[in-house]
């Protein structure tokens, strides 16, 4: 073989000229020059393959090899007969060691190779090993198709069953093996170098080639054992990848729909991820049905953040199928990015490799010693570090080398120091630590274990613990590391344990073993549960311990039986202290927090003697209600802080007391006066009653119970059933009286009930009316429970302070009116003192509408004095000296069809101003609401074309304002809405202007700069236009009138309001509906007519009154009646509209208009008004013309149609002294081509003139003709001809005859022609021989003429004929070609 082939990587042991199994030396090859020096590889000349002449035990320790990355170093050393160890030095978190058995021996010389057999079926390899994470130990099994990763679960020996059993009972293989599967003969691994797993260091690994199920949980595909090329045990150290202590604290989906987030804690400081890294885990989640599912997944990393910190958050591809419960196993290994660590030296042991099973246990091997040579050798096994020394030495020795033998390790295996991270303050290299990790050990039994067992993220107990701790410290959720060291059903004292006689740790009790205790007082040593707990901690050092223990001990104390020694409280305390001492001996003087024991003996419930007391049992149930109808449930919690629980209140059906009608859940944090409470407000129970019985009947008798929800347990109380007592004094903290008439009472009636179908003052649903909104708003703003706020309806129909059907105060006797006296007993009977009195819109606003405004001041004086007297009486009589009256602002009333008119705005403003004045005087009155939107009719309900009472929406909006004002003491009188300052515009009027526009005007009040208007159709009410104006006028133009009414109008439906531009507030409106001012006192001109003059002018004439010669004239376009030609004042009874003005407006060249739309009215210059106008519409009267119209006007082509002169002809005038004006017009643009007076009866439009006018010859003409008086210049009416000129008929059939002499006569059919132009052509060269005009349809070509032309006599005749009519019309020439016949 050549050096080039060798450098290209070809097999140096095989010649390319022969079969690889038949090797030869290189002397037979022609070697090329290499750097001018010939180089040879001298190989042993074996000539032929040798047979396998000895045997080798499969998996012989001397024949294992190692492989690892360049940044670490390792070597393999066999010892004993079945063992080897691998000393290693680790330097990065990417260091990875593979300990391999190769199916094909490619490292030995051909004379010493072992046999290749890829079939491992039936073999079982058992051995002891010390991986850094025994539960995550894997082997890579290579096949020709792919490499598989197989997890090796640890096995422990069960002395009872005498079998090796998988220690991973949750995700293990579930297989067991007989005792002799593993036989220890060599030195075992030192215990100090074994990592504890599942509470023991005594375990082995079993590679069963008949059961190669992949997957962490052994639920993947099965590897085919018949074709394996390599077996490589995967070895790492604790710092590998993210680190041994890395764990998944939480997983949750991101909002992008394509990724989820993984929060990881306990990572190595220098660990980093890269996109494409794979993270494997076994985790649990809740599926869509709420069932827990386990999954084994490999997630691909998209990105991460938080390098070197506890905020290590990873974004991974994919979406989680359910809510994260927990992670049972996490593999953050084999990453793309390496990071430095503190140099670690360790030994990986593989001891007592035991091969069993039915598979082939021995392989054939060649062993052919060679002749001894007295020569040395430099190893050809470049980097032979991966082989055992025994293997290398034996082979070199067998090949005959005896002098010296040198092997070397390449430079790639010397230590390459990586950059480490250094502490800025201390200078310490940070290469071996994990990030900020705060391990908290949870130890004890079931009541602590439940934090890990119950629920799903983020609702598990330890989730809440983590969340609180991390929020407190301001670090990432994964920064706090809860460690589950608990074991359920365990006792702290061995004497109290379920099975104190067995020390085998068996938390499931599946094998009848025990080990469920924490301390053995007699032996003074830790129990299996404590050792298991410490094993869960591993090499971590907890910062604190949460301890919860006692259920099992308490049970043993209550039922000791024949236990010996007998359980006692003293022993339990002593054992607990021992546990604490042991833990502190390991972890230092760390704090231990005790989770309170919740346990009870068989004490019975005093409320229900047959119900035993349980921790958390609700007891001392009670219920009470207020007058509004709210219900409060109360109870006490036995032996449990209620804040730790939730409670479900179950209410029984009043029609079937065995059936639960409704339930709801409250938090146990709702506690007052030693009772846990739950409110059942009218807003809560009315919908329930509506669904159950169809009506909101109030509860009187009730049966209910409460169920404590604690740690996934339900602890029900005994039911409570009785009439619900009324207790306003105990429940209500604020009482709100609402008066004084329907504007206040509507808060309680169907007027504010959105579900009601009527609005007549009937009682509304309490959960829907605005009184509910009032008290809910008050409660929210005041920080009270809704049940503590009670509204009370004290309104009387049509009541005012001193006027109305009912009166609140009698001014004549200065004493309470009938409305106030009617509610006195009811208010006193509430059992609570009223805090507020809401005085809604008083009836004064209605009353003042119908009385003279001069009486208003006296009414307002009485209103104020009566209110003061009433407040003083209420405070004294009802026992609350701090009672306040809160005004619900005065509002107006609207009447009429939509849109209604505000006919009461001035009275309303007067009352409202008085309310504001009183509310700002600090005399016990305040203003709570101006009633939002009450300045607009849309806030009112339409009842029989009147808008008096508010809409449902307005009632609720008012209730919100009142509730907020009362709760927060907001006196809105100090900050009224803008619209309350606005007034209806005064002196609104409209005028019909001379332009036929309508102008609406009103007074401009000082300080007002904007107005909002609406113009509506007087018949339909539809809005024509609306908007904001900046001057006190509006013009309804004639054009807009025509658009809206198809003509002008005198009627208007117009409203206008003052408008606050900054806030958008709108004041009360003024309205105008009716006929605007117009000139009806004037008369309409008569005898209006329009006459067209001979010169084209149009004269309008009319007859007016002699005493009134002021007119307004309007001339309108006949093409668009909305376009005014002119509109102006006029002072005579005629007006001339010149033809020039007509032509200019309509874009005409001459003649002017023929139709008109003209109106004339009498006009009053003093006010700009006009009378009803007289109008003429249509064609103007035509003048009598003495001239005759031109007759016989037409045109003909004098040659080829479309390519010849055009002759225009007409009849000459019959009267002497006259000629004809002929205008030749452009057919398309109507521009004048020629204009001339002609005394003859024709005019020729030459071909040259056509081209000049059109750019081409004409195919049609447009001619206008008028008779013209030569002396006077008068013109007659226009006769117009627009057409294609006429042509003569084409020539018909032709004939050719000859006589005996040879003369040829040619003829043709006549048509309408009277003469013809004939051309005789030479038949041979088509030249014209003879041209002649004939008046008869025939021509003769004499024999001698023919002979002269041709030189011989021929009868072949060719001729063409063009026809001419008598008027000169012609057509195309027709050509004939025929032989003359006799």
From Swiss-Prot:
Keywords: Host-virus interaction, Viral attachment to host adhesion receptor, Viral attachment to host cell, Viral tail protein, Virion, Virus entry into host cell. Assembles to form the non-contractile sheath that surrounds the tail tube. Allows viral attachment to the host by binding the bacterial outer membrane protein NfrA. The gene is 65. Pfam families: NCTSP_N, TIM-barrel_NCTSP. Interacts with host NfrA receptor; this interaction is essential for viral adsorption to the host. It comes from Enterobacteria phage N4. GO terms for biological process: adhesion receptor-mediated virion attachment to host cell; symbiont entry into host cell. This is Non-contractile tail sheath. The keyword Cell membrane does not apply. It is found in: Virion. Its main location: virion. GO terms for cellular component: virus tail. It is uncommon for short-tailed phages to have a tail tube inside a non-contractile sheath.
């Amino acid at each position: 073989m050549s050096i080039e082939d060798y450098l290209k990587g070809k097999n140096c042991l095989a010649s390319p000229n022969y079969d690889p199994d038949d090797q030869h030396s290189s002397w037979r090859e022609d070697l090329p020059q290499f750097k001018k020096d010939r180089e040879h590889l001298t190989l042993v000349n074996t000539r032929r393959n040798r047979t396998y002449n000895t045997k080798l035990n499969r998996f012989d320790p001397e024949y294992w090899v190692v492989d690892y990355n360049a940044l670490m170093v390792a070597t393999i050393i066999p010892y004993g007969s079945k063992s080897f160890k691998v000393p290693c030095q680790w330097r990065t978190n990417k260091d990875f060691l593979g300990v391999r058995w190769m199916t094909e021996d490619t490292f030995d010389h051909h004379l010493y190779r072992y046999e290749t057999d890829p079939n491992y079926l039936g073999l079982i390899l058992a051995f002891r090993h010390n991986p850094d994470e025994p539960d995550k130990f894997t082997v890579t099994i290579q096949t020709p198709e792919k490499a598989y990763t197989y997890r090796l679960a640890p096995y422990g020996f069960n002395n009872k069953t005498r079998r090796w059993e998988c220690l991973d009972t949750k995700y293990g293989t579930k297989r067991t093996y007989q005792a002799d599967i593993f036989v220890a003969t060599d030195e075992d691994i030192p215990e100090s170098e074994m990592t504890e797993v599942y509470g023991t260091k005594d375990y082995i690994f079993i590679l069963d080639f008949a059961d190669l199920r992949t997957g962490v949980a052994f639920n993947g595909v099965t590897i085919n054992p018949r074709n394996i090329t390599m077996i490589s045990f995967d070895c790492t150290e604790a710092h590998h990848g993210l680190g041994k202590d890395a764990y998944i604290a939480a997983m949750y989906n991101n909002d992008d729909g394509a990724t989820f987030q993984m929060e990881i804690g306990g990572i190595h400081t220098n660990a980093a991820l890269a996109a494409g890294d794979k993270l494997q885990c076994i985790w649990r989640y809740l599926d869509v049905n709420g069932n827990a599912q386990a999954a084994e997944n490999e997630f691909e990393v998209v990105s991460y953040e938080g390098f070197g910190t506890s905020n290590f958050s990873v974004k991974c591809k994919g979406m989680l199928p359910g809510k994260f419960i927990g992670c049972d196993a996490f593999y953050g290994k084999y990453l793309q990015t390496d990071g430095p660590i503190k140099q670690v030296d360790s030994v990986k042991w593989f001891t007592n490799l035991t091969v069993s099973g039915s598979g082939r246990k021995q392989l054939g091997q060649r062993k052919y010693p060679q002749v001894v040579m007295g020569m040395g050798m430099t190893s050809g096994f470049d980097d032979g570090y991966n082989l055992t020394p025994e293997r290398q030495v034996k082979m070199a020795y067998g090949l005959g080398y005896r002098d010296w033998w040198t092997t070397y390790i390449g430079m790639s295996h010397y230590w390459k120091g990586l950059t480490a991270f250094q502490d800025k303050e201390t200078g310490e290299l940070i290469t071996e630590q994990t990030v900020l990790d705060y391990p908290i050990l949870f130890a004890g039994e079931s009541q602590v274990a439940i934090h890990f067992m119950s629920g799903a993220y983020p609702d598990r107990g330890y989730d809440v613990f983590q969340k609180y701790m991390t929020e407190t410290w301001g670090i990432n959720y994964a920064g706090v590391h809860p460690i589950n060291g608990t074991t359920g059903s365990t006792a702290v004292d061995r004497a109290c344990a379920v099975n104190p006689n067995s020390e085998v740790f068996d938390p499931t009790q599946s094998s009848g073993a025990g080990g469920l205790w924490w301390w053995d007082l007699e032996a003074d040593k830790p129990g299996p549960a404590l050792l298991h707990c410490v094993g869960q901690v591993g090499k971590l050092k907890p910062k604190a311990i949460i301890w919860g223990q006692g259920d099992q001990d308490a049970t043993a104390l209550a039922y000791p039986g024949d236990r010996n020694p007998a359980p006692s409280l003293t022993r339990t305390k002593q054992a607990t202290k021992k546990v604490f001492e042991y833990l502190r001996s390991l972890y230092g003087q760390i704090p231990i927090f005790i989770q309170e024991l919740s346990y009870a003996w068989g004490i019975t419930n005093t409320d229900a003697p047959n119900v035993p007391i349980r921790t958390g049992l609700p007891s001392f149930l009670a219920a009470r209600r207020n007058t509004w109808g709210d219900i409060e449930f109360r109870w006490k919690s036995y032996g449990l802080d209620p804040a730790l629980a939730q409670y479900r209140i179950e209410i029984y059906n009043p029609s079937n007391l065995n059936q639960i009608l409704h339930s709801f859940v409250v938090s146990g944090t709702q506690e007052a006066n030693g009772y846990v409470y739950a409110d059942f407000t009218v807003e809560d129970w009315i919908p329930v009653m509506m669904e159950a019985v169809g009506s909101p009947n109030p509860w009187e008798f009730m049966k209910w119970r409460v169920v404590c929800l604690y740690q996934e347990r339900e602890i029900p109380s005994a039911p409570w059933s009785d009439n619900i007592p009324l207790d306003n004094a105990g429940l209500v903290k604020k009482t709100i009286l609402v008066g004084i008439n329907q504007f206040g009472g509507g808060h309680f009636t169907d007027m504010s009930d959105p579900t009601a179908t009527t609005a007549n003052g009937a009682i509304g649903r309490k959960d829907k009316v605005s009184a509910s909104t009032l008290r809910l708003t008050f409660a929210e703003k005041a920080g009270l429970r809704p049940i503590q706020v009670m509204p009370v309806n004290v309104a009387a129909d049509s009541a005012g302070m001193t006027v109305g059907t009912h009166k609140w105060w009698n001014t004549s006797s200065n004493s309470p009116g009938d409305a106030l006296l009617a509610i006195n007993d009811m208010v006193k009977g509430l059992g609570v003192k009223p805090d507020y009195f809401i005085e809604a819109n008083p009836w004064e606003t209605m009353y003042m509408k119908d009385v003279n405004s001069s009486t208003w001041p006296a009414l307002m004086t009485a209103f104020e004095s009566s209110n003061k007297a009433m407040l003083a009486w209420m405070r004294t009589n009802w026992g609350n000296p701090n009672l306040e009256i809160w005004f619900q602002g005065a509002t107006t009333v609207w009447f009429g069809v939509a849109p209604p008119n505000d006919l009461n705005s001035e009275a309303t403003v007067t009352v409202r101003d008085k309310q504001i004045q009183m509310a700002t005087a600090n005399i016990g009155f305040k203003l709570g609401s101006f009633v939002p939107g009450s300045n607009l009719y849309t806030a009112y309900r339409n009842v029989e074309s009147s808008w008096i009472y508010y809409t449902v929406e307005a009632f609720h909006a008012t209730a919100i304002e009142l509730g907020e004002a009362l709760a927060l003491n907001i006196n809105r009188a100090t900050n009224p809405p803008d619209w309350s300052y606005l007034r209806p515009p005064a002196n609104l009027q409209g005028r019909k202007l001379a332009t036929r526009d309508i102008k609406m005007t009103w007074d401009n009040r000082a300080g007002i700069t904007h107005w909002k208007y609406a113009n509506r159709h007087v018949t339909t009410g539809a809005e024509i236009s609306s908007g904001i104006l900046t001057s006190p006028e509006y013009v309804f133009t004639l054009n807009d009138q025509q658009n809206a009414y198809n003509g002008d109008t005198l009627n208007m439906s117009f409203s206008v309001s003052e408008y606050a531009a900054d806030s958008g507030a709108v004041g009360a409106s003024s309205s105008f509906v009716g006929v605007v001012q117009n000139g009806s006192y004037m008369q309409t001109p008569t005898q209006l007519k329009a006459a067209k003059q001979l010169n084209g002018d149009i004269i309008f004439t009319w007859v007016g009154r002699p005493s009134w010669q002021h007119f307004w004239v309007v001339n309108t376009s006949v093409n668009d009646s909305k376009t005014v030609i002119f509109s102006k004042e006029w002072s005579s009874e005629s007006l001339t509209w010149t033809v020039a003005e007509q032509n200019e407006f309509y874009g005409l060249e001459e003649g002017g208009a023929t139709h008109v739309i003209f109106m004339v009215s009498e006009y009053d210059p003093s006010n700009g008004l006009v009378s009803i106008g007289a109008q003429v519409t249509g064609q103007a009267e035509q003048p009598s013309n003495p001239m005759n119209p031109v007759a016989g006007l037409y045109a003909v082509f004098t040659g080829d149609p479309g390519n010849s002169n055009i002759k225009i002809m007409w009849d000459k005038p019959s009267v002497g002294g006259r000629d004809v004006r002929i205008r030749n017009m452009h057919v398309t643009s109507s521009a004048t081509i020629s204009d001339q007076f002609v005394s003859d009866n024709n005019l020729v439009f030459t071909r040259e003139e056509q081209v000049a006018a059109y750019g081409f010859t004409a195919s049609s003409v447009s001619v206008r003709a008028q008779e013209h008086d030569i002396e006077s210049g008068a013109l007659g009416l226009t006769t117009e001809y627009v057409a294609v000129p006429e042509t003569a008929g084409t020539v018909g059939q032709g004939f050719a005859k000859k006589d005996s002499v040879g003369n040829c006569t040619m003829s043709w059919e006549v048509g309408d022609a009277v003469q013809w132009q004939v051309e005789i052509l030479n038949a041979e060269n088509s030249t014209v021989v003879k041209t002649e005009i004939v008046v008869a349809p025939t021509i003769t070509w004499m024999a001698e003429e023919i002979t002269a032309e041709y030189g011989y006599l021929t009868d072949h005749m060719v001729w063409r004929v063009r026809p001419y009519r008598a008027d000169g019309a012609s057509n195309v020439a027709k050509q004939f070609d025929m032989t003359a016949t006799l």
